[in-house]
Amino acid sequence: MDKNELPPDVALMWRLRETPRRGPKPSLSLDDIVRAAIEIADADNDLGAVSMARVAERLGNSTMALYRHVKSKDDLLVLMSDAAIERPDPMPEGVDWRTGLTFWADNVLAAIRKHRWYAKIPISGPPAGPNNLAWFDAALGVLNGTGLPEEAKVGVVMGLITYVQGEVRMAFDLAAGYDENPAAFQQFGATLRQVADPRQYPAVARLVEAGVFDEVGSFEDESEADFDFGLQLYLDGVAAFIDRVSPAG
């Protein structure tokens, strides 16, 4: 494939189709536009707050000036999705695959927490921008010593991405729900006692009887604990998979 045949969004993220211009260097760059859009989304904690008009206003330029660099808001969101995640921290030297993937997942979580709106960006394709590809490469590299086939490494990493993204999105949604109606969470155990007939919902009734929902601690602490629990559970499965299929397991 020639570079001119690359998908438009890929070419955009890699800056492969910027129009050369004669004369003085323009006062506005594509990086300026993306940075301003990220700042707006961060300030409002809302991806929907980003518009070409608001970005132009923030930069002190006309909306038409932005369109010389980026054709649409959709293109701008593509650029934001790669720029906001930045590059991953270097992997510590000499770590085993499990420690490495734990480090990687924790860093993905930290990166998304810096830009909570990031969790709302639709995932419509494989990682193709320079920053997202760097994260993908880092996770794949951790699996090098496992003896897994290359295709299996991709499966492990994609499963981990699915877990992290799903857990983050659910945690953010639940946190928003808690802020709106904390009583629904605090009274959940009492509510279940009233509606969950043990004959119809025996497993739920056992949870209620055990007092699992009686105490509601810090929502953020519980979310962190849930993330770590699910992550290690997933990695337990990866360990069993490596032992089963890899000579180096």
List the predicted regions and their residue ranges.
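N-terminal intrinsically disordered/low-complexity leader segments
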Residues: 1-28, 202-211, 246-249
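Helix-turn-helix
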Residues: 32, 36, 40-75
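Amphipathic alpha-helical interaction segments
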Residues: 32, 54, 75, 103, ...
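Alpha-helical structural segments
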Residues: 32-39, 75-90, 103-107, 134, ...
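Hydrophobic alpha-helical connector segments
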Residues: 89-134, 150-153, 157-160
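Hydrophobic alpha-helical bundle segments that form small-molecule/ligand-binding pockets
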Residues: 135-157, 161-190, 238-241
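Amphipathic C-terminal alpha-helical segment
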Residues: 162-176, 194-219, 236-244
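Short, flexible active-site recognition loops that position polar ligands and cofactors
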Residues: 216-228
